[in-house]
Amino acid sequence: MPKLKTRKAAAKRFRATGTGKIVRRKAGKSHLLEHKSSDKKRSMSKTTLVHERDELNVRLMLPYL
């Protein structure tokens, strides 16, 4: 059986934790930041877990994660 290919776009966006959960960065912190509050920008800097309903799709895109 041939090797499974990894979706490179997904590989750049998702990482696995030590316990196997998938983490992602929050969107909206690359530009147009001037009108956003400091609290908003600080909360967007943190990583968050991928929702359980999206986790299967991410795992299919990253077979070796």
Swiss-Prot record:
Ribonucleoprotein: present as a keyword of the record? yes
GO BP terms: namely:
translation
Q: Which UniProt keywords apply?
A: Ribonucleoprotein, Ribosomal protein
Basic and acidic residues: compositionally biased ranges: 31-42
Keyword RNA-binding recorded: no
Q: Name one GO cellular component term.
A: cytosolic large ribosomal subunit
Gene Ontology MF terms in the entry = structural constituent of ribosome
The domain of life for this entry's organism is Bacteria
Question: SUPFAM superfamilies from the xrefs?
Answer: L35p-like
State the residue spans of region: Disordered.
24-48
Q: Name one Pfam family in it.
A: Ribosomal_L35p
Under PANTHER family, the record lists: 54S RIBOSOMAL PROTEIN BL35M, LARGE RIBOSOMAL SUBUNIT PROTEIN BL35M
What NCBIfam families does the entry give?
rpmI_bact (TIGR00001)
What family does the Swiss-Prot or TrEMBL record give for this protein?
Belongs to the bacterial ribosomal protein bL35 family.
**Name listed for the protein in its UniProt record:** Large ribosomal subunit protein bL35
Q: Which organism is it from?
A: Nostoc punctiforme (strain ATCC 29133 / PCC 73102)
Per the UniProt record, the lineage of the source organism begins with:
Bacteria, Bacillati, Cyanobacteriota, Cyanophyceae, Nostocales
The gene it comes from is rpmI
